[in-house]
From Swiss-Prot:
Catalytic activity, EC: 3.1.-.-
Class of enzymatic activity (EC top level): hydrolase
Keyword Metal-binding carried by entry: no
Domain of life: Bacteria
Cofactor(s) needed by this chain: Mg(2+)
Example of a GO biological process term: double-strand break repair via homologous recombination
Name the record gives this protein: ATP-dependent helicase/deoxyribonuclease subunit B
Length: 1077
């Protein structure tokens, strides 16, 4: 055993490679061992340090792989299971327990997180060199009994399936101890690099090999000062020192301090000595010179986006200086927080990168396919699950148009549940092509219908049916087409996912082939395996920027290192125990255990592990290290890491980067895609601010560069503007939609739509777009239902009582096909019908026969011509006649409405005046009767606040007051209206005033007609206060944003409340007089 150590300013890998090279020249076989997380980088570093850059005598590997080299040809080798296979074994074991058998974990038998914890505990017991029996020191005996029972069943299942129930390292250790490998090991030298501690399993192997290998050489980082110190707690080198001292005691050998030929820059050495002095309590410090300050810099940025962009531009500048991507390493404080942002910005700057981390499969279409399939079975064919399956792009053959059409029908008909999906669609024949839909339904659902009917049977039979189902829906062919047009790197990702998927199927066949399972269990097992699976990619080329977590970095890893997100939350990383065994229980087990096995207690290792990680990070670069921190991390403020505070205190430069500085040098632009992105950002921001001379110079250089690039690609720069100008509809379309020889057809609702937003009129009445419809009743259907009840009620001139007539009207309406189908679909619809019946009965109290009023007609259609160029169509719900012969118009409303002269003036309430104009100009009536008014009737069941009601008599009175006609009434008919149920306050108009209203109403139609016929429709939703937009905006279509486009909104003309009525009447009269002139 040889123990070597050197300080952080020298290269331990170079030292150990020299040892390996000399041993190889002497004829020994060398195994160079690196940690799992560093094996790829360590292999490259070892090869670069070898004089010949390669050697057949030197094998760079890991402990687990080392075991395979020596035991591959050993007899009685059993099949190993990966984590997914182990999870399946535990799932099967837990399923064998009856309810109540597991006292602590009984409710977690099917919980995926619990199964994952069991798998982690199983592997940790192997690594710790412990058996399940040694958990008897747990605080809870019931917990130990449950875990023991579970693990015993797992052991039986592994033995029955002839699976390997021990790790490769444990098997290798047994073989070494037995002496079977002595011949192979006697010519072997083992070199161990990159460790600061061994697991119990690795330590047992080292002990076994120490007496059988020719030599074992272990290297670690520690300074002579730290190694000779009596007290090492808190020392920056404490991890390496404690490791070396433990090995020295265990193997009775003295560590040797050695120096490499390569030495880091003096600046890094000076900083390292300052940091060491702060942590060994000697307070020795060295003033940083300019060389040291050039080595390490701290950047403070505003947020993560700015932070990554600064680094991306710095990388581009390194390329201009002649360096390669492979010379640059990017480290992340929190990979999950930065991965998406970094990927997006690096692609903008054309920086190829490689994430040194296993990637999850959760976002892959194949995972969505399995998840949707599992949900379909579990939740009995919810519409969203079925559609999600079809939308994966790898299910069946269907065009996007057919899929959209199918989805529209599913939403309309509210198709859910297997019965509705597996039977022909019959609802909505007037709106949809049911023949086309049923053809689509059969092609998509026939394979699924057959598969979901799978009964409980042996796993192998279910798997075969599943494979047949995948063939029917063309899964592999669809996946091939999906990835066919992708880049080579993306294709490799899909291949890795497919390989993982097939491995899961093989594991299932092996483990559950003879086990009886129902389809839910089958899909749940496969889906959980897919969701938890990960895969690793090998970089397509060596010349890429490597990206990984900072705690995986080794000293002197690359020329330039950028460490992002070095905030207090992530630097240092505080390891937390989330396993089934607490730290206290781990300590109890370790104290009671007299074997070589022991649990690692990470919380006890946090300090020295984090100190060494910080030291490694500060020496990760050979030329320059940049540490960056954002002021906002994940949209919340975070503090600077205490390690960075130490650097700042000893004089390391601290730069506030702020927003990207704009300099006139061409290399500061970055690259074409990045510049284009910045132009887009500028377009989206406020650009009316004053620019500094430096910013003006930058953009003048940038625009010249951008114009050259765009010209070479044949692209023109569009005018950047906030305008929402629309294109005039072609004359051909306008002629087809509005023939010149025909009058323009309008209605009061169409006019309201036009003045709400001209573009809304274009969408609704020119393009003919409709809102998503449904078989379930909504406000439109509710209003139609109540209209029909009152129509039948008022036509009934029989001798029955009013209540009998009302009940008869309700019953007849309920039996009409259209309403019967609408309100009998489900419990929700039936409940809506009960509410509507209550509303009808409550509103009908106002319709009782009144001696002063009779119903003249109902559902009266009318056509009103204006200058022979505009035809206004409509239906009047009811026309009443008073005792003096005057007529009035009633319009039923399902919500509260009243006549607002301000809204009327602005074109938003033309309905009542239009109805008055219609009946006053009726050609079929020779002698025109007077008009007493036009009004709304709110169909409602009045509700009162009982806390404000003093006695029950007041309750009845207030209910009757709520049921009144509201609108505009003729002042001449006041005496006939006073005793009726009419709201007359501020609602009486003289004949002259009504004439003014009618004239203005016609003017509104004429102005709208002129605009409509011009084909130019503005995006101008109305606003009442010039601060908020009240009209319909259609943001997804128009791109209208209130904060940017308020100037485009149509501001309503408003007057003070006291002046509103007379003021608007005066305005209308003046406008009419001006038009006459």
């Amino acid at each position: 055993m040889k123990l070597l150590y050197t300080d952080i300013n020298h290269d331990m890998t170079e030292i150990l490679v020299n040892q390996a090279a000399h041993a190889a020249e002497a004829g020994w076989r060398i195994f160079y061992i690196a940690p799992n997380s560093l094996s790829f980088e360590k292999e490259r570093a070892v090869l670069e340090n070898l004089p010949q850059e390669a050697s057949f005598a030197i094998t760079i590997t890991r402990f687990a792989q080392l075991a395979r080299y020596f035991t591959l040809n050993q007899p009685n080798q059993k099949e190993s299971l990966n984590d997914i296979g182990l999870a399946m074994i535990f799932y099967r074991a837990l399923a064998s327990f009856e309810d109540g058998q597991l006292k602590v974990f009984g409710r977690l038998k099917q919980d995926a997180s619990f199964i994952s914890q069991l798998v982690d505990l199983y592997k940790e017991l192997q690594t710790a060199n412990l058996s399940i029996l040694e958990l008897k020191y747990l605080h809870s005996p019931e917990k130990f009994e449950d875990l023991l029972a579970i693990f015993l069943v797992v052991s039986d299942l592994l033995r029955e399936g002839e699976y390997d129930n021990q790790s490769k390292i444990a098997f290798f250790t047994e073989q070494v101890r037995s002496g079977q490998l002595d011949v192979d090991l006697k010519n072997t030298i083992l070199i161990v690099d990159g460790f600061t501690r061994f697991s119990a399993e690795e330590e047992a192997l080292i002990k076994s090999l120490s007496s059988r290998c020719q030599e074992i050489i272990i290297g670690a980082y520690a300074s002579q000062k730290a190694y000779k110190a009596n007290f090492t707690n808190g020392n920056i080198y404490s991890a390496g020192v404690d490791f070396l001292r433990y090995l020295a005691t265990t193997f009775q050998t003295k560590p040797e301090f050695i120096l490499s030929k390569w030495e880091s820059k003096s600046g890094f050495e000076m900083i390292s000595k300052n940091i060491e002095g702060k942590h060994d309590f000697t307070n020795s410090s060295h003033i940083l010179d300019d060389t040291a300050k050039d080595c390490i810099t701290i950047w403070e940025c505003i947020n993560q986006k700015d932070e990554v962009e600064h680094v991306a531009r710095a990388i581009r500048q390194k390329l201009y200086q002649g360096y390669r991507y492979k010379d640059i390493l990017v480290l992340l404080g929190d990979v999950d927080s930065y991965k998406l942002q970094l990927s997006k910005i690096f692609e903008q700057y054309d920086i190829p990168y490689y994430f040194g981390k296993a990637e999850t499969m959760a976002a892959h279409p194949l995972v969505h396919f399995m998840d949707s399939l599992s949900r379909i079975k579990r939740y009995r064919f919810r519409a969203e699950d079925v559609l999600n399956l079809f939308k994966t792009g790898i299910y069946g053959e269907i065009s996007q148009d057919d899929l959209d059409y199918f989805e529209a029908y599913i939403s309309y008909a509210d198709i859910k549940g297997p019965k509705k999906f597996f039977t022909d669609f019959v609802v909505g024949a007037k709106k949809f092509d049911l023949g086309r839909l049923n053809t689509i339904r059969q092609s998509l659902l026939t394979p699924l219908e057959s598969f979901v009917k799978t009964k409980k049977q042996d796993g192998i039979k279910t798997l075969n049916q599943f494979m047949f189902f995948l063939t029917q829906v063309g899964l592999s062919d669809n996946l091939s087409r999906l990835v066919g047009q992708m880049s080579e790197n993306e294709q490799e990702k899909h291949q890795e996912v497919w390989k993982t998927f097939t491995d899961i199927l093989e594991q299932f066949q092996t483990i559950f082939g003879q086990e009886k399972l129902n389809l839910d269990e089958f899909l749940s097992l496969l889906n959980s395996g897919m969701m938890q699976a990960e895969y690793r990619m090998v970089p397509a080329t060596v010349d890429v920027v490597t990206v990984k977590s900072y705690d995986l970095v080794e000293p002197h890893s690359n020329q330039f290192v950028y460490a992002l997100g070095m905030t207090q939350s992530h630097f240092p990383k505080i390891a937390q125990n989330k396993s089934l065994i607490s730290d206290i229980e781990r300590q109890l087990i370790n104290d009671a255990n007299d074997t070589d096995g022991h649990f690692d207690i990470m919380t006890q290792e946090n300090l020295k592990k984090n100190h060494f990680a910080a030291l490694s990070l500060f020496n990760a670069a050979k030329q320059e290290l940049v540490l960056t921190i954002p002021q906002l991390l994940n949209e919340s403020e975070d503090q600077m890491s205490p390690y960075l505070v130490e650097l700042r205190d000893i004089g390391v430069p601290f730069n506030h980067k702020g927003r990207q500085s704009l300099k006139e040098e061409a290399d500061n632009i970055g690259n074409y895609k990045a510049l284009l992105s910045r132009v887009v950002d500028l377009y989206r921001s406020a650009i009316d601010k004053e620019m500094t001379k430096e910013e003006q110079t930058f953009w003048s250089v940038a625009v010249r560069y951008l114009r050259r690039q765009l010209t070479s690609k044949g692209i023109e720069i569009p005018i950047i503007t906030d305008s929402l100008d629309t294109v005039t509809v072609s004359s051909d379309v306008m002629t087809r939609r509005f023939p010149e020889d025909d009058p323009l057809k309008l209605s009061s609702s169409a006019l309201t739509t036009f003045y709400n937003n001209q573009y809304k009129y274009f969408l609704q009445y020119v393009l003919g777009l409709e809102e998503q419809d449904s078989i379930h009743p909504d406000m439109r259907h509710h209003g139609t239902y109540l209209h029909r009840v009152f129509e039948i009620l008022m036509k009934n001139q029989g001798i029955e009582s009013f209540e009998e007539k009302l009940n008869s009207a309700i019953n007849k309406t309920n039996q009409e096909d259209v309403f019967k189908s609408l309100y009998s679909e489900d419990a929700e619809s039936r409940y809506s019908l009960e509410i509507l019946e209550d509303i009808a009965r409550a509103t009908a109290t106002i319709l009782r026969q009144d001696s002063q009023m009779t119903v003249e007609s109902e559902e009266e259609r009318f056509e009103l011509m204006i200058d022979n160029t505009i035809k206004i169509n409509g239906i009047i719900d009811r026309i009443d006649r008073l005792s003096d012969g005057s007529l009035g118009v009633v319009d039923y409303k399902s919500s509260a409405q009243k006549f607002d002269i301000q809204k009327f003036y602005n074109g938003l309430s033309p309905q009542l005046v239009t109805y008055i104009d219609a009946i006053s100009r009726d050609k079929e009536v020779e002698q025109k009767p007077p008009i007493f008014g036009a009004m709304y009737l709110h169909m409602q069941e009045p509700r009162q606040d009982l806390s404000k009601i003093k006695n029950l008599d007041d309750l009845v009175t207030k209910n009757h007051q709520a049921l009144t006609y509201k609108g505009l009434f003729s002042e001449a008919e006041k005496e006939f209206l006073a005793n009726g149920k009419y709201h007359l306050k501020d609602s009486l108009y003289s004949e002259t005033e009504i004439a003014i209203l009618q004239a203005h109403n016609q003017s509104l139609y004429k102005k709208a007609s002129e605009t409509i016929k011009s084909g130019k429709f503005l995006i101008n939703p109305y606003t009442e206060d010039a601060k908020t937009v009240d009209g319909d905006q259609f943001k997804s279509i128009t791109g209208f944003e209130a904060d940017r486009h308020m100037a485009r909104a149509r501001a309503l003309y408003k007057l003070p409340a006291k002046e509103k009525r007379q003021g608007f009447l005066t305005l209308m009269q003046q406008e009419e007089e001006n038009d006459d002139l």
